[in-house]
């Protein structure tokens, strides 16, 4: 069932998503080689709480084994939803950070991929094509289109035009 949101609800959703964006912007300022993803997660956790948000991933799951982190951080070939850890980031790493925040009872959630230092030409190309694919999908996120239309646009650009794979 689809629940239509009113203007006030949409504004609250926007504010939550904006705090996710601000958190990712804060992370962008500090990322560097030698830093651990566990440290980055702690920065994320504190920033969210300092801005009256609640990290929505933290504590998620069964009571016996809740997710312990404020974010999911994937480095290089870790596909998605990696756990922050004590491994140090290196020059050329690509780091995807996924953050969810509850603000005023509304969730905001998105991810961003960062390069640590100067990545290889191959990695730069992957990042470029991935970003282009995102925008191809966004172009198809219009009234009367389906999720499949968005997915097809992304897959077409990523796989058929550039030879990369899409995780399913």
Residue ranges and their predicted role:
Residues 1-168:
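Active-site neighborhoods and metal-handling regions in enzymes and metal-associated proteins
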């Amino acid at each position: 069932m689809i629940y239509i949101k009113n203007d006030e609800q949409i504004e609250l959703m926007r504010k939550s998503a904006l705090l996710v964006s601000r958190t990712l912007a804060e992370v962008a300022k500090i990322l560097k080689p030698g830093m651990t993803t566990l440290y980055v997660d702690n920065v994320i956790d504190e920033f969210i709480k300092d801005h009256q948000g609640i990290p929505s991933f933290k504590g998620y799951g069964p009571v016996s084994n809740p997710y312990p982190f404020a974010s999911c951080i994937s480095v290089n070939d870790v596909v998605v939803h990696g756990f922050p850890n004590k491994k140090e980031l290196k020059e050329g790493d690509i780091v995807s950070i996924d953050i969810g925040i509850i603000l005023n009872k509304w969730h905001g959630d998105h991810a961003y991929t960062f390069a640590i230092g100067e990545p290889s030409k191959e990695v730069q190309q992957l990042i470029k094509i991935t970003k282009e694919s995102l925008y191809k999908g966004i172009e198809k996120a219009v009234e009367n289109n389906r999720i499949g239309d968005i997915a097809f646009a992304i897959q077409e650009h990523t796989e058929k035009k550039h030879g990369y794979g899409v995780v399913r």
